[in-house]
């Protein structure tokens, strides 16, 4: 094995270049990361509304929905489709022990512009309906009841592509959403890159696995950590780490 030393945010990382072929497991079973399905318990209303991001806003008449969701539901047989804004709201509890950790909302897809509010505060935005994104909501959470509100629009923009042809570009949170809770030192969103540069040259018989991982340190402390990546074969048996 070869070891390469990197420094990122005050953390020393040993990134292992594993000289074995096989599948790569980058998340161990005992990982401190929690992933919570965030698809249930939403409310939705078509249109744009002042103060809909505020926790005290009256959404009692809004439609109760689950995700994934589309602006066109239940009008998918209509010849026309709605272009404009829609709001989503969801209340959820937070325990005290979560507040010292990092919490992210991970969206697999929102068409096509999204503004994410937590307890009335703008936590982040995203443009583009085909790519996932992660929003850090840690600073806006409180113990007890919390409120996330998402303002979405599917208005035409010349700088957001592709949008042409006969396909219907309905708006909405049309893919899954997760609440991901991580320790203060954590692997970033899509923070692991894996390549096998000589696998084709060796015709799949053997190859080196190159791994790069970005680790973020939000603890405010400088320390030394050991980053462990495990290689398993097709049957799930550990081959190296």
Language-model features and meaning:
Residues 36, 48, 70, 83-189, ...:
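Accessory beta-strand-rich segments of carbohydrate-active enzymes
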Residues 103, 205-213:
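Structural beta-strand segments of beta-rich domains
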Residues 188-190, 208-210, 225-227:
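Active-site region of glycoside hydrolase catalytic domains
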Residues 55-57, 222-228:
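Short flexible loop/turn segments that cap and initiate beta-strands
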Residues 216:
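Acidic, Ser/Thr
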Residues 196-207:
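Short, solvent-exposed loop/linker segments at the N-terminal edge
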Residues 2-15, 22-25:
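Bacterial N-terminal signal peptides that target proteins for export
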Residues 14, 25-79, 147, 151-157, ...:
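Accessory carbohydrate-binding/adhesion or oligomerization-edge regions at the termini
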């Amino acid at each position: 094995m070869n070891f390469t030393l990197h420094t990122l945010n005050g953390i020393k990382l040993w990134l292992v270049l594993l000289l074995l072929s096989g599948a790569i497991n980058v998340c161990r079973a005992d990982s401190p990361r929690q992933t919570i399905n965030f698809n249930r318990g939403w409310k939705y209303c078509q249109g744009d509304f002042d103060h809909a991001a505020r926790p005290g806003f009256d959404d009692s008449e809004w439609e109760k929905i689950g995700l994934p969701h589309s602006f066109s539901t239940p009008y998918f047989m209509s010849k026309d489709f709605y272009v404009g804004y829609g709001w989503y709201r969801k209340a959820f509890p937070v325990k005290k022990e979560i507040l010292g950790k990092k919490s992210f909302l991970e969206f697999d897809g929102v068409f096509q512009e999204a503004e994410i509010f937590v307890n009335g505060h703008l936590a982040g935005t995203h443009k583009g309906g085909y790519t996932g994104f992660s929003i850090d909501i840690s600073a806006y959470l409180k113990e007890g009841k919390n409120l996330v509100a998402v303002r979405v629009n599917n208005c035409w923009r010349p700088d957001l592509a592709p949008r042409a042809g006969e396909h219907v570009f309905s708006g909405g949170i049309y893919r899954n959403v997760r609440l991901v809770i991580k320790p203060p030192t954590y692997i970033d969103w899509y923070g692991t890159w894996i390549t096998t540069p000589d696998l084709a040259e060796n015709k799949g018989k053997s190859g080196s696995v190159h791994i790069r991982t970005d680790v973020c340190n939000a603890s405010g402390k400088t320390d030394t950590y050991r980053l462990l990546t495990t290689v398993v074969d097709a049957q799930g048996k550990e081959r190296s780490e």
